[in-house]
A protein has these predicted regions:
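Conserved H-loop
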Residues: 207-216
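A short helix-turn-beta junction within AAA+ P-loop NTPase domains corresponding to the substrate/partner-engaging
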Residues: 220-228
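P-loop NTPase motor domains
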Residues: 1-202, 215, 220
Length: 228
């Protein structure tokens, strides 16, 4: 899940992951957003890639982080970790680790997000007119895990739709994304997904029960009615 093919996709994924963690945390601040965003970007920038398991180790293991940064070419990211982060200290990563530990505690979830070499290629699903079903039952994996995994999947399909900028319009295979209880997976990128999905031949079928469920995401509500 932690993979991206362009700078835009990397920025999108990092932003979405920060928003997901912020929504799940009772105590969150700008410093935590900065630390988590730069950690995700470091993994995405490295040719070695990374997983959410690597993300946790990157935050707590100084040696592991130092070795990882050797393969990161983005000077802004390396400057943050080598110069700014030591001034911040580890106090900023507590809520981040709490969410990661909750998420990775489930062996089922670890099997999904802990693979550097993906066995499921969502691009092939999207371009090959295939069907992909994700059962995100809160009773099976927990409410927070369902939200985190569902939001990451929505973000992933958004990345794949943006990658279609490199394709001729005639070559963009129509694909339809169905999201039940979609307000549970709302991230900032959902707004741009709603406004820009059509030109990338991505259709969205979003189900919810009442309009009151959308009050927590007003920008998405506006984009939803504007593009219905």
């Amino acid at each position: 899940i932690l993979s991206a093919g362009s700078d835009i996709e990397r920025t999108l994924l990092a932003s979405d992951l920060v928003s997901i963690f912020r929504r799940l945390s009772t105590s969150w601040g700008d410093t935590m957003s900065t630390v988590l965003g730069n950690a995700v970007l470091a993994l995405l920038e490295s040719p070695s890639g990374g997983t959410l398991i690597d993300l946790r180790r990157f935050l707590v293991d100084d040696r592991f982080r130092k070795d990882y940064l050797e393969s990161v070419e983005d000077e802004e990211i390396t400057f943050f970790w080598r110069r700014e982060y030591p001034l911040i200290g580890s106090r900023a990563i507590g809520p981040i680790l709490t969410r990661l530990d909750t998420f990775l505690r489930s062996k089922l979830i670890r099997h999904v997000v802990g693979q550097k070499q993906a066995k499921l290629h969502l691009r092939a699903v999207m371009e090959g007119r295939k069907i992909f079903l994700a059962k995100l039952s809160q009773g099976l994996i927990g409410e927070e895990n369902a939200y985190l995994l569902g939001s990451l999947l929505v973000s992933k399909f958004h990345q794949l739709s943006l990658a279609r900028q490199q394709q001729a319009k005639a070559d963009r295979t129509p694909f339809y994304l169905y999201a039940d209880e979609f307000q549970s997976f709302a991230t900032p990128s959902m707004e741009s997904l709603l406004t820009g999905a059509r030109k990338y031949r991505l259709g969205l079928i979003l189900a919810h029960q009442t309009l009151a469920q959308l009050e927590a995401v007003p920008k998405i509500t506006s984009a939803l009615f504007g593009n219905a």
